[in-house]
Amino acid sequence: MGWLDFSSKSKKEEKDDTRPSFTWGDNLNATDWQHYTDPRTVIPTILLTTTILVSTRLYRSYLRRIPEAAYIRPGFFRKRSLFGTVTRVGDADNFHLFHTPGGRLAGWGWMPGRKKLPEGKDLKNKTIHVRIAGVDAPEGAHFGKPAQPFSAEALAWLREYIQNRRVRAYIYKRDQYDRVVATVWVRRFLVRKDVGKEMLRAGMATVYEAKMGAEFGDFEAQYRAIEEEAKKKKLGMWSGKKKDYESPRDYKTRTANAAKMLK
């Protein structure tokens, strides 16, 4: 009987020896690329990235608060509107707006941190100066110049109409005084009203007469028709004698020329 050779390897063991050997370091540093191409990983990643990009764009375009007119991007003009609260009416055809993008849906008026708007000195550098498009109100007393007739009445009218109210301004451009020229709408008794039209209707303003830079949106013809109606009814600034009437544009031209002559 022959001796069994225990030192010899079976064919299976010899075959196994041909497999490459791995170390623990290889296993720890190995990259499982299949994990990154697995639909269970790819699809959630794409959805999350898309959501972040869309949310960022939505915030920048519609929900980011604009503190002053200088911060309005050129691409916004004639394409976007500004919603906010009128904090101050300093003149009869312009006012200051605290921008509240998204309105109550974005938490303005009820959410902590947005429940109450700033007041007084806290509003400095936080409001947008808005010039109402298409109309010109009687000039108040400025820089030593006398006030025009009905300037006080026009200012009081505008304050009563929009002060502390939420308005929407459809913006056209920024003027030389860093004001935003806009058609402004306000809700009065649940009805949206064009503030410029209502000023003309009440005889508290004229149609803007400047030869250059006038902005009306699509309402110039309507504005002129409403002005003519107020003239016929002798409302507001049209109630005096025709010979005594001086338009805001003529007043500004006359006082500017007088100031030049004094230099």
UniProtKB/Swiss-Prot annotation:
Active site: 131, 139, 179
Region of interest (Disordered), ranges: 1-21, 236-263
Lineage: Eukaryota, Fungi, Dikarya, Ascomycota, Pezizomycotina
Boundaries of every TNase-like domain copy: 80-240
Membrane topology: Single-pass membrane protein
Transmembrane stretches, start-end: 41-59
One Gene Ontology cellular component: mitochondrion
One Pfam family per UniProt: SNase
Protein residues bound to Ca(2+): 136
Database matches in PROSITE patterns: TNASE_3
Listed SUPFAM superfamilies: Staphylococcal nuclease
Subcellular location: Mitochondrion; Membrane
Record family assignment: Belongs to the LCL3 family.
EC number: 3.1.-.-
Alphabetical list of SMART domains matching this protein: SNc
Gene3D superfamilies associated with the record: 2.40.50.90
Name of this chain's protein: Probable endonuclease lcl3
Biased composition (Basic and acidic residues): 8-19, 241-253
Top EC group: hydrolase
Keywords assigned: Calcium, Endonuclease, Hydrolase, Membrane, Metal-binding, Mitochondrion, Nuclease, Transmembrane, Transmembrane helix
Origin superkingdom: Eukaryota
GO molecular function terms listed in the Swiss-Prot or TrEMBL record: endonuclease activity; metal ion binding
Gene from which this protein is expressed: lcl3
